[in-house]
Amino acid sequence: MMRITAPIKRWLKRGLPPGMLLSLRKRYAILRYRGTARYCPACDSHLARFIAGGEFLNRPEARCPACGALERHRLIALFFREWSDLYAGGDRSMLHFSPEAVFEQQFRRIPGLDYLTADLSDPRVMVQMDIAAIPYPDQHFDIIYCSHVLEHVPDDRQAIRELRRVLKPSGWAVLQVPVTAERTIEDPTITDPQERLRLFGQEDHVRRYGIDYPERLEAAGFRVLAIPAEGIAGEARIARLGIDEDEKVFFCTPEENAIYRQISGRMG
């Protein structure tokens, strides 16, 4: 099987639009990893296996070779497709912080969706903004998706209040963070990257979230459903989808609205 060398990969990344690059990557991966033992709901690919991922490639079968989705992305992709009304169409607006390439191209194609990407410093997004000071009026967005951002934000409580403020009463948000402790650990005086790595798990993290994370969301006025991966995927599909069984989706609404009742009812 032909292999794509590193120089060719760099040339492709520089010379092709993101959507075309993802398409070529998917076709190549499906040929190289031909099989059905694994399925990626983020890009709808059937594969023989996933590949190692993580900063030190220490998580076997973490990454989809076709689209780059990690365990958390595959869980969110499944939730969006099978549990939410994201793909239902209709005139709605969506705010996506720190957009992942695997989702951005899909969301842009949803009929009727006024899709906005945002980040503090990434020049590729549509609007550069501070998540703790969102420059939009109250009750502006129908959907908000923000994954693995809040652990980088010094005042996450203010950021969560802002997310709640700009969400319509009928809307919903998925606000994901890595949860790796019993209780949230934070100390704003710690600025040394190595000390942050030791205490918070990454040099640019300012806290380590615990299982009390939903309490922060609720303190800002959100109604929160912490939905386990097994509840979303079903025990039989966890391994094939390459999903972390300990992961949860944090589904938030500004009040007990129709979509909250629908999702809550599915949880039983």
What is each residue range found by the language model?
Residues 143-144, 163:
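Alpha-helical membrane segments in multi-pass integral membrane proteins
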Residues 2-135, 235-268:
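Conserved N-terminal segment of class I S-adenosyl-L-methionine
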Residues 147-152:
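Short catalytic micro-motifs in class I SAM-dependent methyltransferases
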Residues 97, 144-145:
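Hydrophobic beta-strand segment of the Class I
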Residues 25-38, 154-163, 168-268:
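S-adenosyl-L-methionine-dependent methyltransferase catalytic module, highlighting the catalytic core
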